Amino acid sequence: MLQTFSPSYKPLHLPISSLSLSSSSSSSASSVAFPVTRLLIPPRLRVLPNPRRRCSALPFDIRGGKGMSEFYEVELKVRDYELDQYGVVNNAVYASYCQHGRHELLESFGLSCDAVARNGDALALSELSLKFLAPLRSGDKFVVKVRLSGSSAARLYFDHLIFKLPNQEPILDAKGTAVWLDKNYRPVRIPPEVRSKLVQFLRNEES
C-alpha cells in the first residue's frame, strides 16, 4: 500500500533584515536543509534598472524613423492611351505615376530597383492608398511629388502628391508602403549599405 509522507517541519520565513552579504552568512544560509518559500533580496537590490537595448541599425531604421522634409518632384505629361472611356486618366494609371516618382526618388539616393532585383532581393509595394481630388485629361502636364515620410527595420513609407501644371491644382493624395523582401519573398531588414545611403541623403538634405 502506498503511503504519503508529510514532512514534520514548516517552511522557514526569514526577515529581510537578517540577510547579510558577508561570506559567513552565505555559508550558513547554504547549509539550511529545508526550502525557503520567500525570496530574500536586500532592499538596495530590490529595484534594478532596466537593461539598455543595443541596436546595430542606424537611427533611420526604427519604427517611425525620420523622413524627408522636402518633396522630390518629377514632371510628366498625360498620354492618350492612359485615358478611359470618359476621356480622363484611368484611376489605375495613377498608381503607375506614383511608382515612377518613387523609383526616381530612390535613384536620387543611389538606389536602383533594377540593381536590387539583380541581387535577388526586392523592394515591393505592400500598401497604397489613393485619394482622387480632380481628373487629368489628354495632354495635361503635371508634377508628381514624392518624399520618404518614415521607416522601420524592413519598410519604407512614402507620401505622394500630384498637381496639375501650371496652376498647381491638386489632383491626387496617396500614401504607400514598400517592404524589403529576400529571395524567398519574406520581409527582411533593409541591408546596411542601403540604410547608409538613405541616412546620408537625409543628412545632406538637412545641411
Curated annotation (Swiss-Prot):
GO biological process: lipid metabolic process
Entry annotation: catalytic residues: 84
InterPro entries: 4-hydroxybenzoyl-CoA_TE, HotDog_dom_sf
EC number assigned by the record: 3.1.2.-
A cellular component term, taken from the record's GO annotations: chloroplast
Keyword terms, alphabetized: Chloroplast, Hydrolase, Lipid metabolism, Plastid, Transit peptide
Alphabetical list of SUPFAM superfamilies matching this protein: Thioesterase/thiol ester dehydrase-isomerase (SSF54637)
Recorded superkingdom: Eukaryota
Transit peptide range per the UniProt entry: 1-63
Statement: the UniProt record of this protein carries the keyword Chloroplast: yes
One Gene Ontology term of the molecular function aspect: fatty acyl-[ACP] hydrolase activity
Tissue specificity: Mostly expressed at low levels in glandular trichomes (lupulin glands), and, to a lower extent, in stems, leaves, flowers and cones.
Subcellular location(s) of the protein: Plastid, Chloroplast
Pfam family, one: 4HBT_2
Role, per record: Acyl-ACP thioesterase involved in the production of fatty acids and beta-keto fatty acids. May play a role in cuticular wax synthesis.
Family to which this protein belongs: Belongs to the 4-hydroxybenzoyl-CoA thioesterase family.
Name of the molecule in the record: Acyl-acyl carrier protein thioesterase TE3, chloroplastic
Organism: Humulus lupulus (European hop)
Native organism taxonomy: Eukaryota, Viridiplantae, Streptophyta, Embryophyta, Tracheophyta
Gene: TE3
